[in-house]
UniProtKB/Swiss-Prot annotation:
TM helices/strands, residue ranges: 29-49
Residue ranges that the UniProt entry lists as topological domain Extracellular: 23-28
Annotated coiled-coil segments of the chain: none
Main location: membrane
Name of the molecule in the record: Putative uncharacterized transmembrane protein DDB_G0287329
Location(s) in or outside the cell: Membrane
Domain of life: Eukaryota
Length: 72
């Protein structure tokens, strides 16, 4: 569980760093750089969302079911 927390924290920090890079690159002369930075931000946001969904979705689904319907 500790490694998942560290991994999620690193993903958040990297996404913030890429967001800063993407917002700062809009002043560059190349028109493809802001789009590239936005794609990086979207990829990191999707990675964070999928990691959170992978961790919390099974618990959330089984918590909605009645206890007697869950068989192990």
């Amino acid at each position: 569980m500790q490694s998942n927390f560290i991994f999620a924290t690193l993903l958040v920090l990297l996404s913030l760093l890429t967001f800063t890079y993407a917002s700062g690159s809009s002043s560059m002369t190349s028109s493809s750089m802001p789009m590239f930075g936005g794609a990086i931000v979207a990829a990191f946001a999707f990675a964070i969302f999928s990691r959170l969904a992978q961790n919390f979705a099974p618990r959330a689904i089984f918590s909605l079911l009645p206890y007697h319907s869950v068989s192990c």
